[in-house]
Amino acid sequence: MDKTVAQRLAEIQREQREWSLRNFGVQQAHRMALGLIEELGEVAEAWMLDSKEKLFDSIGDVGIYMLNYCNIAGWELPSLYEMRQPRDKNAERMPHFVTPLMRAIAHHQLKGEQNIRGGAEHHARMMEGLFRNILFQMEALSAHAVKGGTFLSILEATWQKVSKRDWVQNPNNADVVAENG
């Protein structure tokens, strides 16, 4: 029996939580926010270069950082995925959506940690909304990265590679070591 998208996302989230703790220990959310901002920038760059390979890689990396952020925040990515939505009426316009999202991620992460302008809970809710929008965007872009592609199919392919990396044993090149087997 095939697993649903939500079941598979939950499974990857559990696996990623264990992998992240093993490789990096307990991390802070702002580090994942920085990683997510970096990867969204790579999505925009891949789009502008019209590079399907780079788009595929960056979408998968966005997913990995989102999983890690969700694990730290205590959120379930499948729930956010099922409630994914555009941020505004122009949500599918690329690459223009990236800069406002990156700014909003930085804003809500910073203000939430400072507990100002609405407090930590307000900014956490805003971040959840941003994640739902990012998931909407990544799902839409996945079909551009690979014919018939979905966010889940790209995340699974990326996770298959990333999960083999041991950053404790190979802190300078775990990606290369894992790829060369």
Enumerate the language-model features and the residues they cover:
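Flexible "arm" and connector segments at domain edges
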Residues: 1-181
